[in-house]
């Protein structure tokens, strides 16, 4: 891997770790609002189209109109799935065995996205 590839990745990971430090103190309500804000930002029609156009231009695959629809459906589905999910703080407590489960941000998650599903 050459430095022109590594440098942007290092910059992104640094920014993600900085964001993680901020999110460490967020409550469940704040995380829920953040999740909804990100979803609505993606669903905003001009931004959705921009993302769809970028995906088609970057991969050479698909059709912009189909990508716009897919972005819309998948984003709404993800928000629906995350809506009632506990993601920070106390998740479960079992007093019978004295075990409590807590969730918190633990690190940066990165993935290589298949070009067929950007």
Stretch-by-stretch model annotation:
Residues 1-100:
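N-terminal Rossmann-like NAD(P)+-binding subdomain of aldehyde/semialdehyde dehydrogenases
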Residues 90-118:
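Substrate-binding/gating loop at the entrance of the active-site cleft, primarily
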């Amino acid at each position: 891997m050459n430095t022109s590839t590594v440098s942007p990745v290092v910059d992104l990971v640094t920014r993600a770790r900085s964001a993680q430090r901020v999110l460490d103190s967020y409550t469940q309500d704040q995380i829920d609002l953040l999740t909804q804000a990100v979803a609505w930002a993606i669903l905003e029609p001009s931004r959705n189209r921009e993302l769809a156009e970028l995906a088609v231009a970057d991969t050479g695959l698909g059709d912009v109109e189909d990508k716009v629809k897919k972005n819309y459906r998948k984003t709404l589905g993800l928000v629906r799935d995350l809506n009632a999910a506990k993601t920070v703080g106390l998740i479960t407590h079992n007093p019978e065995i004295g075990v409590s489960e807590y969730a918190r941000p633990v690190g940066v998650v990165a993935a290589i996205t298949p070009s067929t599903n950007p």
